[in-house]
Amino acid sequence: MTLEQFVQSHPPRPPVIRPQTKDEQRRLGVDDGVFFIEAPPIDSPVFGRRGTANGRYLWVISRDATPAILETAPKVRPPLQSGVAKHTNLTGGDEACCGGELWLDVLEGTRLHITGGSGRYPPRSPQELDDVVLLLESRGFGVHSAGWDQDTDRPARVFR
């Protein structure tokens, strides 16, 4: 799946939860630690245990890119007031198709573990989350998704 196909199937929309402060609307860039999920390997990776705060990255799919940042945002200057990045920091509060969390696999550098865990840009359906997997796989990554929680009708946040 290409980014263009993804955007056509799952059009961008404003964040479900609007930025609460100017800091949450501040668009972060490459100097702040933002990178684009284009092809493996990820430069200067930080590894963590999937499903935990350690090594958790935030990602979004926008109309023209797939930016990501380490949630702790250690390179951001001046530091964020909350101490952590929000998905809206990847968009400046603008529209995005969807977003979530990811962890890099410590043993297999081309494997990503993802969730659709975003309060601001959650995937709207199981198909949208499945299409995120297809998009990332088309870029050369192996992808393990936490999937969709049928009980809550939302992206699962726990890996099984």
Where are these regions (language model features)?
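Eukaryotic phosphoinositide-binding membrane-targeting regions
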Residues: M1-R160
